[in-house]
């Protein structure tokens, strides 16, 4: 109302109101709400505890005091007596319980214990991680039925002496060569230092008369021709690589010898490759 009157301009005197009281002999129709008395009012004894009057006598009369030092124990004084300062003595070692005593003498032993616990934990975590990784890797390996199909059994009595027979193994050509005595002596007499990929003949065979190779040229993956080439072994028609009867590179662009797969003689005339 006052703000409206202040902004009304020339109508402000009309909008303002004045109240006056005139004394008279007539008695009031209503009694006074608070009778006049000379006795002091009685305060309610059940007043709220958390009020300004109740807290004024319990508040701290002095500021909070804290004492901290290098050779003295830390202490804090509060206004309330029911507050318990946390005590971590049960978690501390006996050598460092006394704050007024130097703990330098026991520092090496405490460090050694910490290092021992850390190293033990690290080894345990590494072992657990190794097992987890091993199980994960083994889950991606081939199953037993797939591994069974990856092996091939060859009857050696079907291959005459001096001949080479090709088989299909894991989608690749597999050469099994029955060498003659002349071929065995010839390949054993080759000087290893003259070879591009130095390897003695006895390192590539388990039985001198049998040579088992993967028929894939190590240059660009072509299939060599058996009993051909300048050295009577294998010849790659793609780029002219020559291999001897032991599958070693002797001439041409191929950088390595023919690969020797994993095989095992189960009997005198049966070999299992894979």
Curated annotation (Swiss-Prot):
Cofactor mode of binding and number, as noted:
Binds 1 [2Fe-2S] cluster per subunit. Fe-S cluster delivery to the Rieske protein is mediated by components of the iron sulfur (Fe-S) cluster assembly machinery that reside in the mitochondrial matrix (including HSC20 and LYRM7).
Subcellular location(s) of the protein: Mitochondrion inner membrane
Q: Give the CC-aspect GO terms.
A: mitochondrial inner membrane; mitochondrial membrane; mitochondrion; respiratory chain complex III
Keyword Cell membrane annotated: no
Q: Which UniProt keywords apply?
A: 2Fe-2S, Disulfide bond, Electron transport, Iron, Iron-sulfur, Membrane, Metal-binding, Mitochondrion, Mitochondrion inner membrane, Respiratory chain, Transit peptide, Translocase, Transmembrane, Transmembrane helix, Transport
**GO MF annotations for this entry?**
2 iron, 2 sulfur cluster binding; metal ion binding; oxidoreductase activity; protein-containing complex binding; ubiquinol-cytochrome-c reductase activity
Q: What is this protein called?
A: Cytochrome b-c1 complex subunit Rieske, mitochondrial
Q: What is the lineage of its organism?
A: Eukaryota, Metazoa, Chordata, Craniata, Vertebrata
